[in-house]
Amino acid sequence: MHDVPWTLTREQFNLEAVLGLKTQTTLAVIVPAKNEASTIGAVLDAISTHAGLIDELVVVNDHSSDDTGVVADHHGARVVNLSGTSGKGAAMSAGLRATSSELLVFLDADVINTTTEYVPRLIQPLLEKEEVQLVKGYYERPLHNMPTGGGRVNELSARPILSLLYPGLGEIKQPLAGETAGRRSTFEAITMETSYGVEIALLIDIAHKFSVGALAQVDLGIRRHRNRPLEEL
């Protein structure tokens, strides 16, 4: 049994193979967003480059007080408006209910350098390995003017705690990453945490229900996001 997560490096990414295999299934991309009018348009434009890749593009607008929904609609997404602030996990669940595709990709709306390869990279393990149920992105996170240093909560808290629960989970480089892909059947087989704890809960639930070997992680390069004040979270 494969008891550690699968890892897809940048060198192993094969866009042509992904586009070919994708024709055999359907894909929804879901972007939970709250007050991300300044970044959501660029995110949607970047991921919409490859014709025929995405069958459903949905932005779940979590009670934004800015023009997030308007901008998302202008950039081609179907907008699902939540009536009140619900939390990231609840927004992800709303996106799940609003779509019907077999494969799902969840992306953060505040990333300022989302690339055209995010979506195909995230689904490659799902297309190539039937045993993979959930995929997480990993990346370098510059901090201020330093090339690395971001993601300290991952290194100091999340990974050590996960290692205590399931040793193989400590191999996940970015357990708190919002860039996630999986199979509809997998998401429907578990109970989604409603808050920001959804990222950790997904890993634990998948490892428990399937195995650590049902997880994969893919290299997304360098990630930069808009830092928000605490009251916006």
What spans do the regions from the language model cover?
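A conserved acidic beta->alpha catalytic loop
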Residues: N61-G69
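Catalytic donor-sugar/metal-binding loop of nucleotide-sugar-dependent glycosyltransferases
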Residues: T194, I204-G221
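Active-site donor/metal-binding and catalytic loop motifs
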Residues: A216-L233
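Acceptor/aglycone-binding surface of glycosyltransferases and processive sugar-polymer synthases
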Residues: M92-A94, T116-T186
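N-proximal low-complexity "stem/linker" segments adjacent to membrane-targeting elements
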Residues: M1-D45
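Conserved donor nucleotide-binding strand/loop of the catalytic core
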Residues: D55, G69-A98
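Short aromatic/hydrophobic "clamp" motif used to bind/position activated sugar donors
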Residues: L104
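Short, acidic, metal-binding catalytic loop of nucleotide-sugar glycosyltransferases
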Residues: D45-I54
